[in-house]
């Protein structure tokens, strides 16, 4: 089967935004205009095509990035819909990793919102070019130029309108194209056929002003254009478009368009901007990877290169089972063929290849470089794995995922649920790298951990619906940590005689605090073989094993150094096990000397509220042991930034809603660990039965 669309005519884009900026509706309209849907689905009626999990339709938010393919003006556009809620930033990171460009959707009333900033920063990290779509121009309070201003103020983005709106709120009727210098009016409800007219007289001056600003901004990025501009020569519209494309691809310039997806206005010109200014797979740098011999190598977007791809999402589909979404970076892949999962060192068979259209799937026999598709039949592949040609193996740069910050205990309601719960949790953990399920060795409870309350709510909900498992969920528990504040030299000695061969391990270790974020560091400073070389790894393993169960309240120990500097051994009785135990005893003994403390996760919280609630909200943050880090006015709202312990943030959403009559919003994400105040540390130790027991 020959390639249907050339690489140059392929676009892999994401739609990214703050929750509720109208991202899913925007994607819907794209699918409608590109002929993939015959009836428009409304998110607020729960009938959207992209939101295909039941909970997404109920809650009206997008949780899973469904990958969809569409066609527009002879181009293939693969769209990944990304969630806007902060608990799902891993989904956003995961999709940005495999995109070439993105459309950032803003709400015309609010402009840049907290989650927009988070997603924008992630896109900048991955060097993703962006077009900005100012949506909801029909909404009360919509203000296009204010929204563009927020891009400059809050994101320091070099963003410039390539369109202006004609009217706003309920008088929004079309857009001015600053490149063609004409006006598009939408006169039918579906916006299928906009009428091209002259720019209205009352907007002519504004259009000239912004056309001038656009030309100047583009000229600044290109020497040749700058010379023409300074010499007063006319810059043609072809040169202007080429300049915008170059600046956008270099992530130095962001074209801004406007419209209202809900009222079907401005979506097609936004699609044109995607084709005109966002990159084809051939415009982005080749992806780097590591060959089996450790050498670095690149893979280019080219069908003739060896096959290489990255699995970026695993899902369980009720009809076809396990689906692995992957992005092809080089080469081609036929259904029914074998590939190598080079990350895990496993051979996998690709049963079928599907191209997804939200929740309708199309089977295809081959995928080419630059494509996004889903494979059926892969057994061992998880998110972030490389799939490649068996003969030309490579491991592509993988993805890094944040550690979970919130934990809850979960119990099956019946014996029948118990067996199914284990399988369900394993499946969910396979799909989502930021979700963990484990059994507490001491209490036997099953604990699940994730990125926030909503994240865990939705996973428990999925367990009930998809796997038919009923479960009771406990109160959220914070993932505390422990560390040392002082250095000390400590002995660990394990001697046991029980007839016949005994056990003997003896170490002296200097423990001390490490820099924040450095983790555990082990140093072997043994001289003269007082502890034989073959037992050193056992000492390190003994310490690493004991770190999971801290000395105060049993929380994992982080950011400590251990230097093994002395010890002794017995010719007959010493063995690896004895040195492992001796090392873990030394760590226990360090509790008395190293001033251990409990650390708690601190969240960076941003609250956006109307001015009149400012005093109450600030007071409430302080009462939650938070400290305010900064404030600013944003439009007619106040933004409060603070660091608050996670332990005091449970139930905050409900408090904020009731305290501001539903007008306040907040986002939070893990920032760093901090020492817990003494009185609270005592409560935590007491609640955990104290862990500092003699072994």
Swiss-Prot record:
Keywords attached to this entry: Cytoplasm, Elongation factor, GTP-binding, Nucleotide-binding, Protein biosynthesis
Keyword Disulfide bond: no
SMART domains: EFG_C, EFG_IV
BP term (GO), one: ribosome disassembly
Subcellular location: Cytoplasm
Alphabetical list of InterPro entries matching this protein: EFG_II (IPR041095), EFG_III (IPR009022), EFG_III/V (IPR035647), EFG_IV (IPR047872), EFG_V (IPR035649), EFG_V-like (IPR000640), EFTu-like_2 (IPR004161), G_TR_CS (IPR031157)
Matches recorded under Gene3D superfamilies: 3.30.230.10, 3.30.70.240, Elongation Factor G (Translational Gtpase), domain 3 (3.30.70.870), P-loop containing nucleotide triphosphate hydrolases (3.40.50.300), Translation factors (2.40.30.10)
A Pfam family assignment: EFG_III
Superkingdom per UniProt: Bacteria
Amino-acid positions noted as binding GTP in the UniProt annotation, renumbered to this chain: 17-24, 81-85, 135-138
Keyword GTP-binding: yes
Residue ranges annotated for the tr-type G domain, each copy included: 8-282
GO MF annotations in UniProt: GTP binding; GTPase activity; translation elongation factor activity
Cellular component aspect of the GO annotation: cytoplasm
UniProt similarity note: Belongs to the TRAFAC class translation factor GTPase superfamily. Classic translation factor GTPase family. EF-G/EF-2 subfamily.
Function: Catalyzes the GTP-dependent ribosomal translocation step during translation elongation. During this step, the ribosome changes from the pre-translocational (PRE) to the post-translocational (POST) state as the newly formed A-site-bound peptidyl-tRNA and P-site-bound deacylated tRNA move to the P and E sites, respectively. Catalyzes the coordinated movement of the two tRNA molecules, the mRNA and conformational changes in the ribosome.
NCBIfam families attached to this UniProt entry: EF-G, PRK12740.1-3, PRK12740.1-5, small_GTP
Record's protein name: Elongation factor G
Gene (UniProt): fusA
């Amino acid at each position: 089967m020959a390639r249907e669309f050339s690489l140059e005519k392929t676009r892999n884009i994401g739609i990214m935004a703050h929750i509720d900026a109208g991202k899913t509706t925007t994607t819907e309209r794209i699918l409608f205009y590109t002929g993939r849907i015959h009836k428009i689905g409304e998110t607020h009626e729960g009938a959207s095509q992209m939101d295909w999990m039941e909970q997404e339709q109920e809650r009206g938010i997008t949780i899973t990035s469904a990958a969809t393919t569409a066609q527009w003006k002879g181009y293939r556009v693969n769209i990944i819909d990304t969630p806007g809620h902060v608990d799902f930033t891993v989904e956003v990171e995961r999709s940005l990793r495999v995109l070439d460009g993105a459309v950032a959707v803003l709400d015309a009333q609010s402009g840049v919102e907290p989650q927009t900033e988070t997603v924008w920063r992630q896109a900048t990290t991955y060097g993703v070019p962006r077009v900005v779509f100012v949506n909801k121009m029909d909404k009360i309070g919509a203000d296009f130029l204010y929204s563009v201003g927020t891009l400059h103020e809050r994101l320091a983005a070099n963003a410039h309108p390539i369109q202006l709106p004609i009217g706003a709120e309920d008088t929004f009727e079309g857009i001015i194209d600053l490149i063609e210098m004409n006006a598009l009016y939408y006169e039918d409800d579906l916006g299928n056929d906009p009428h091209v007219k002259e720019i209205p007289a009352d907007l002519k001056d504004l259009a000239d002003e912004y056309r001038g600003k656009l030309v100047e901004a583009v000229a600044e990025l290109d020497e040749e254009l700058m010379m023409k501009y300074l010499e007063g020569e006319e810059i043609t519209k072809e040169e202007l478009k080429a300049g915008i494309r170059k600046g956008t691809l270099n992530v130095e310039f962001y074209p801004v368009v406007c419209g209202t997806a809900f009222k079907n206005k401005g979506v097609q010109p936004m699609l044109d901007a995607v084709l005109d200014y966002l990159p084809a797979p051939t415009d982005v740098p080749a992806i780097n990877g590591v060959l089996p011999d450790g050498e670095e190598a690149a893979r280019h977007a080219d069908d003739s290169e060896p096959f290489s791809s990255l699995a970026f999402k695993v899902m369980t589909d009720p009809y076809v089972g396990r689906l692995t979404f992957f992005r092809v970076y080089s080469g081609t892949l036929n259904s029914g063929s074998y590939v190598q999962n080079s990350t895990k060192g496993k051979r996998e068979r690709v049963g079928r290849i599907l191209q997804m259209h939200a929740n309708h799937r199309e089977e295809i026999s081959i995928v080419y470089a630059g494509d996004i598709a889903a494979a059926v039949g892969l057994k061992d592949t998880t998110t972030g794995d490389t799939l490649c040609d068996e003969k030309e193996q490579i491991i592509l740069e993988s993805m890094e995922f944040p550690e979970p910050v919130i934990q809850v205990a979960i119990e099956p309601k019946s014996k029948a649920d118990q067996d199914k719960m284990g399988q369900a949790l394993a499946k969910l953990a396979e799909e989502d790298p930021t979700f963990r399920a484990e059994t507490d060795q001491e209490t036997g409870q099953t604990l699940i951990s994730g990125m926030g309350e909503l994240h865990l709510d939705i996973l428990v909900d999925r367990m009930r619906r998809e796997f038919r498992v009923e479960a009771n969920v406990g109160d959220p528990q914070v993932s505390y940590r422990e560390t040392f504040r002082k250095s000390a030299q400590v002995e660990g000695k394990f001697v046991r005689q029980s007839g016949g061969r005994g056990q003997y391990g003896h170490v002296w270790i200097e423990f001390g605090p490490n820099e924040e974020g450095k983790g555990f560091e082990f140093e072997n400073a043994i001289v003269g073989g007082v502890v034989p070389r073959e037992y050193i790894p056992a000492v390190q393993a003994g310490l690493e094993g004991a770190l999971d169960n801290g000395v105060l309240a049993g929380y994992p120990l982080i950011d400590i150094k251990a230097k093994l500097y002395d010890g002794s051994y017995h010719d007959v009785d010493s063995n690896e096990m004895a040195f492992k135990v001796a090392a873990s005893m030394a760590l226990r003994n360090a509790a008395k000397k190293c001033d251990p403390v409990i650390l708690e996760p601190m969240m960076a919280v941003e609250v956006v509220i109307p001015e009149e609630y400012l005093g109450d909200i600030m007071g409430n943050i302080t009462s939650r042991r938070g400290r305010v880090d900064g404030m600013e006015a944003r439009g007619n709202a106040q933004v409060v930034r603070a660091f608050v312990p996670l332990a005091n943030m449970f139930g905050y959403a409900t408090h904020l809603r009731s305290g501001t009559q539903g007008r306040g919003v907040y986002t939070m994400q893990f920032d760093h660990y901090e020492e817990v105040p003494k009185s609270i540390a005592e409560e935590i130790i007491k609640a955990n039965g104290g862990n500092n027991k003699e072994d």
